[in-house]
Amino acid sequence: MEKRTSYCGELNEAHIGQSVVLHGWVQKRRDLGGLIFIDLRDREGIVQVVFNPEFSKEALEIADSVRNEFVVTIKGTVHARGEKAINEKLATGKVEVLAEEITILNSSKTPPFYIEDGVNVSDELRLKYRYLDLRRPEMNNIFKMRHTVTRTFRNKLDALGFFDIETPYLTKSTPEGARDYLVPSRVYPGNFYALPQSPQILKQLLMTAGFDKYYQIVRCFRDEDLRGDRQPEFTQIDLETSFLTKEEIQAITEDMLVDVVKEAKNITIDKPFPRMTYKEAMDRFGSDKPDIRFGLELQNVSDVVKDVDFKVFQSAIENGGEVKAINAKAAAANFSRKDLDALGVFVANYGAKGLAWLKVEAGELKGPIAKFFPEEKATELKASLQAEDGDLLLFAADKADIVAASLGALRNKLGKELNLINEEELAFLWVTDWPLFEYDEEAGRYVSAHHPFTLPKEEDIPLLETDSSKVMAEAYDIVLNGYEIGGGSLRIYKKEVQESMFRALGFTDESAKEQFGFLMDALEYGTPPHGGIALGLDRIVMILAGRNNLRDTIAFPKTGSAVDPLTNAPGEVSEAQLAELKLETVKKETN
């Protein structure tokens, strides 16, 4: 096989007159009155190859037998296309290759779908033939971008003096949040390793070991319910540092992300990134990961409506809840009564008991609840919401968390439906000052908002075991376009604080020692103050590539039901394998 001289997609006018050797796949073949044209594709793009009997009759005869997706080597000379033959849609569209020789390296069956962008095919089929799906230029470009992003992170962290250190995949199962993927031990029957949900504890131990700055581009595993931006295995940019403040860790993160966006998209992002507290994010946007590319902010109108004779509002306020509204500017005409009923059904998914609404027409409030607002109150409400003719006012009344969840989700829905979002914009945001705990209704107790190793604010440490709800954390999340792309914090580095944290979470001293004894021991040997962050590589690439599903940014992903259609994983194993592991399977009973 002759050595390749160029990639197909790299050829341009500078190559005119040069002899080239190309390897690639036949994208398309056209037979036009004695001439054959082949679009040859490789990872860098497509170039047109011309087979002319006057130049090489033998090459033309071989080209006549090739079909789509055949793998070939072509030798020829680069020529300029004629003025009328220039293809502006193609990067190589001003040149073509006049073929002298063609060698068929391998044939191909007819693919189950066209290998081209925009092909209408089910996700299931795409994943079953993922190796074909990845040939499509748009998919190829995503993984070029992923490589650029990964390389940029590595280069930046290396320049900042971080050590790339690997942590084990076979580790101990600890109660950190989601369910673990378990791996049975053959040597110790009845015992299991766990695949890591993150290298959290181990990277903290590397700080105890004195490495000062650690990073790892690491695979993590969580056995949880899936959705569009979740996968059972995912990759994070994981880093940890000693002796730095949270502001310094955030500055390092910003520097990395600015470089990544510049390299991947050639867009310059301003620093420092905007920031807001968790409370402000929930109050204004109803979300702890707000998309700040558009308005539609939530506004508290409890004081305005507390005296109106509308029982839904009155009841919510009397029971310690609140009434909030969104003013969708100039949107009243966009929504019929039927549309508004549908929005009511939508917010019910988030716990809301309904969605009240008003329209502003000719200076007056119109709608089902307008009768509850006498002129003075109507004027006060319009002033409070800066409402004008044509505006649509949407209200939720309930407990604060339900109001936030329902109006926050509604805000995101309206932002898309009303075309308020600039899809080209990249809006980074820090969300800071998180509560250390959140209340789990199902468990009936407080659980870690992030993880049990997050450092409480110093002034709140005495409250750990007495008033958990008031303890704030030295935690920070980084958000991009409404997605959480990373979470970090300063960590607990003193044993007595970690013991107090475990007790606050309901661990007995004995159970804490059993689960985390190795960490507690390490904290007795001079662990330095430390902190870090983990950034979701798959999600960052998803956003930069303009996709809406993580599957597109992972080479061999799972479906929404955690199945791999390509390999048919997960699958059953043999009785011999189970016997070796001293395991039995329990068959699910079916009616």
From Swiss-Prot:
Chain positions recorded as L-aspartate binding sites: 176, 222, 450, 491
Reactions this protein catalyses: tRNA(Asp) + L-aspartate + ATP = L-aspartyl-tRNA(Asp) + AMP + diphosphate
UniProtKB keywords: Aminoacyl-tRNA synthetase, ATP-binding, Cytoplasm, Ligase, Nucleotide-binding, Protein biosynthesis
Listed GO MF terms: aspartate-tRNA ligase activity; ATP binding; catalytic activity, acting on a protein; nucleic acid binding; transferase activity
GO CC annotations on file: cytoplasm
Enzyme Commission designation: 6.1.1.12
Amino-acid positions noted as binding ATP in the UniProt annotation, renumbered to this chain: 222-224, 231, 484, 536-539
Signal sequence, renumbered to the chain: none
Protein biosynthesis among keywords: yes
Region (Aspartate): 200-203
GO BP terms: aspartyl-tRNA aminoacylation
Any Pfam family the entry gives: tRNA_anti-codon
Highest taxon of the lineage: Bacteria
Subcellular location: Cytoplasm
InterPro entries in the record: Aa-tRNA-synt_II, aa-tRNA-synth_II, aa-tRNA-synth_II/BPL/LPL, Asp-tRNA-ligase_1, Asp-tRNA-ligase_1_N, Asp/Asn-tRNA-synth_IIb, AspRS_core, GAD-like_sf
Keyword Electron transport: no
Membership in a protein family: Belongs to the class-II aminoacyl-tRNA synthetase family. Type 1 subfamily.
Function per UniProt: Catalyzes the attachment of L-aspartate to tRNA(Asp) in a two-step reaction: L-aspartate is first activated by ATP to form Asp-AMP and then transferred to the acceptor end of tRNA(Asp).
PANTHER family per record: ASPARTATE--TRNA LIGASE, MITOCHONDRIAL (PTHR22594:SF5), ASPARTYL/LYSYL-TRNA SYNTHETASE (PTHR22594)
Summary of subunit composition and partner proteins: Homodimer.
Name of this protein: Aspartate--tRNA ligase
Organism per entry: Listeria monocytogenes serotype 4b (strain CLIP80459)
